[in-house]
Amino acid sequence: MHELALFTKIGMKTSELNLKAEILMAKYNVAPSFKGYRGFPGVVCTSVNEEVVNAIPGKRILKDGDIISIDCGVIHKGFHTDAAVTVMLGDIKPEVRTFVKTVQQSLEKGLAQIQPGVKTGDIGFAIGQWIESRGYSVVRDFIGHGVGRQLHEEPEVPNLGK
């Protein structure tokens, strides 16, 4: 993920990130988790600005002021991974920086809840409460999830809860 983030530049197509990810996967001798999963054609998801998640890499050209979420999964020794990184390109508006920071903080709030006996709803509550207390809303149609021998496993972790 770090190498993909560093590779991401203004003026490139999101398809170039996909190609770079394929090259890196070959270099590290891992297989893509996403390619072919439910018909997905890429090895990474490249969601730019208003695109929420799971966007297909293509001809979209990255511009000054864009934010891009790069979501990547690999299979290593029979186990899947799934992680994402957000890259801010060029001159980012203050309100966009604040938004990205708030989302990162919400992840940290959720992770801080994890301990034996805590329910996934408690984790989601911490995430959702932080987001909503900052004037944003949570996309309710998407959740976090476990990984293992399969790409999507239990537990499901919502971004809101009680």
Can you name each region flagged by the protein language model?
Residues 1-162:
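Active-site neighborhoods and metal-handling regions in enzymes and metal-associated proteins
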